[in-house]
Amino acid sequence: MGFFRILFSLSLCALSLAIPSKLIGLENTKDVIPNSYIVVMKSAVSEAEFQSHQAWASKIHSRSLGKRDGVLDDFGGLKATFQFEGLKGYSGAFDKKTIELITRNPAVDYVEVDRVVKLDAISTQRDAPSWGLGRISHRRVGSADYVFDDSAGSGITIYGVDTGIDIRHPEFGGRAAWGTNTVDDEDTDQNGHGTHTAGTFGGATYGIAKKANIVAVKVLNAQGTGTTSGVIQGIQWCTDHAGRNGLRGKAAMNLSLGIRGSTIFNRVAEAAQASGIFLAVAAGNDGTDAGQFSPASARGVCTAAATNSQDAATSWSNYGSVVAVYGPGADIVSAYPNDDTATLSGTSMASPHVCGVGAYLMALEGIGPDTVCDRIKQLASESVTNQKPNTTKKLLYNGSGA
């Protein structure tokens, strides 16, 4: 399914006994990145204190390496910082003694282990017909026509935080630009997932917000893998870019990825939403409660579950009270790298439908990111079948009147 997951691997029993309780994320045991951590500072820490703490952390890291005769191994030290309103911290690779000292530092709120981001299995069918656009612009099943206002997301910028985007694809007509890359040195989409999601939220043929500007933010590589800390860096870049370019209040972000139970991921998503960017996120493809995943369970984001062409919730879509709305997610055709198309399935496909409608409504109605998800829920059709208990029946609708 088209959904990215951040999970754990490696036994951490000995580590959990040695390091204070402020180190979180030890309850899972799949795909942890050895010796890699995300350090979150207490909210009262000033900028000067944050800088001082970084210098201190680098010093004790160097001292620890000195005791190891300068052997670097996997301990590269402080790698990147992040700062949102009321939330700051850094990521890095540290040995056991160093991370124990960092965790005990009174300026530190908590430390979370870093994890690998993976691409779930994707089903691909070349050049198949799509149905999602017709479905979100009609109250009833069956129409192949997409009915929409000509504003079509004009003036809104959408950040695709994913595997990158083939910005030269004809679907984007020069509206797509490269933003940043936190995972490798290849500034293109070598996987296809990111181009596909961008085609859904903003493509000329397969997209919803056909006049929106699109920015590629690559956080996952050709194999569909990255890190929690890398995704945080990507989101940080988006909020900074929106601030520098006067886009806060006129921007949306698609996150077709997730992690099981991450405090820091939820907080970063909430901070990005609060900064003036509408966030649409995938519920996940585990057929379980989306409340167990982040950022699906973050406050204020618009979490999307998936339906098929007959309005039935798919068996693999996550569900639960955190789901805001269902969107088309099975057999969705969209753009693919090298001027191609592909058909993919997953909540990764439902999320860009929600993101695209969010951008469309922001342009059409002049509403802000903080009210977009409520407006989406208000417009939605109560037509989803086969959904699990404690889950909405709301199906995405753009308000076209058809």
Curated annotation (Swiss-Prot):
Domain of life: Eukaryota
Subcellular location: Secreted
Principal subcellular localisation of the protein: secreted
Entry keyword annotation includes Hydrolase: yes
GO MF annotations, alphabetized: serine-type endopeptidase activity
Active site: D162 (charge relay system), H193 (charge relay system), S348 (charge relay system)
GO cellular component terms attached to this protein's record: extracellular region
Any GO BP annotation: proteolysis
Enzyme class: hydrolase
Statement: the UniProt record of this protein carries the keyword Hydrolase: yes
Propeptide residues according to the Swiss-Prot or TrEMBL record: 19-120
Glycan attachment positions: N254, N390, N398
Signal peptide: 1-18
Gene3D superfamilies associated with the record: Peptidase S8 propeptide/proteinase inhibitor I9, Peptidase S8/S53 domain
EC number: 3.4.21.-
Domain Peptidase S8: 130-402
Domain annotation Inhibitor I9: ranges: 36-119
Cited InterPro entries: PCSK9_ProteinaseK-like, Peptidase_S8/S53_dom, Peptidase_S8/S53_dom_sf, Peptidase_S8_Ser-AS, Peptidase_S8_subtilisin-like, Peptidase_S8_subtilisin-rel, S8pro/Inhibitor_I9, S8pro/Inhibitor_I9_sf
Pfam families, per database record: Inhibitor_I9, Peptidase_S8
Family: Belongs to the peptidase S8 family.
Functional description taken from the UniProt entry: Secreted subtilisin-like serine protease with keratinolytic activity that contributes to pathogenicity.
Designated name of the protein: Subtilisin-like protease 9
Organism, scientific name: Arthroderma gypseum (strain ATCC MYA-4604 / CBS 118893) (Microsporum gypseum)
